UniProtKB/Swiss-Prot annotation:
Function text: Binds the 23S rRNA.
The organism of origin for this protein: Phytoplasma mali (strain AT)
InterPro entries per UniProt: Ribosomal_bL28/bL31-like_sf (IPR034704), Ribosomal_bL31 (IPR002150), Ribosomal_bL31_A (IPR027491), Ribosomal_bL31_sf (IPR042105)
The name this protein goes by in its record: Large ribosomal subunit protein bL31
Keywords: Ribonucleoprotein, Ribosomal protein, RNA-binding, rRNA-binding
GO biological process, one term: translation
Gene this chain is encoded by: rpmE
Amino acid sequence: MKKKLHPILKKIPLVCATCKKQHVIDTTVENIHIEICANCHPFYVGKQNFTTVAGRVDKFNKRYQNKVK
């Protein structure tokens, strides 16, 4: 059999950016970044989490609401 054929697996901590929960996985890469995991994803949790980010129209209205009055 050939030696050094298979990549070396190592355990790395994987931290969710949303809920900050840490998962340990086996992988060949050095680091992995995830934005959302199964613990906080609305599909798996069963409820909607709204993170309100102002859209372009909201930013425009907020900027010019004092000038109209």
